[in-house]
C-alpha cells in the first residue's frame, strides 16, 4: 500500500494527518507540475515523431475554482507562486500555459501584486475580472481590473476585502 507523505520542518507526516487543505490542493499542484513537465518534455524532444504525440498541447489552459479553500493564507501565497512558476516554465515554449483562476483570496491577489512589484511578473500578463451584481439592474457586471507596475490594483472597489459597515 502506498501513502502520500508531507515533509515538514518537524518531520514527515501522512497527508491524512496534516489537514484538509493539503488534500484539496494536491490535485492543483499535481496538474501544475504535470503541465510544466509535459511541455518541457515536448520542447526538449527534437524527434519529429515523438513531437507528433504532443501536438494536442498547442496551448495549455488550466481552469481552477477557489484553489485557496481550506488553506492557511501563507500557503495560499505559496500556491500563487506555483501559478507564476508554471506560467514562467512554459512561457518560452511553443506551448505556453494560461491559467484561469477563480478566487476570493486576498493572499493570492496580494502575492501576485508583490511579484509584479518585484519585477518577477509583468502586469500585462495578469488580468483580474471582478464580477459585481448591479442591484438596480439585477444583472452581474464584469469589470476588468489591472495591476500597476508597483503591484497595486487600479480602480479596486472600496470595501471588497474589508466590507463597509
Tell me what each language-model feature is:
Residues 1-157, 161-162:
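Switch/communication elements of ASCE P-loop NTPase nucleotide-binding domains
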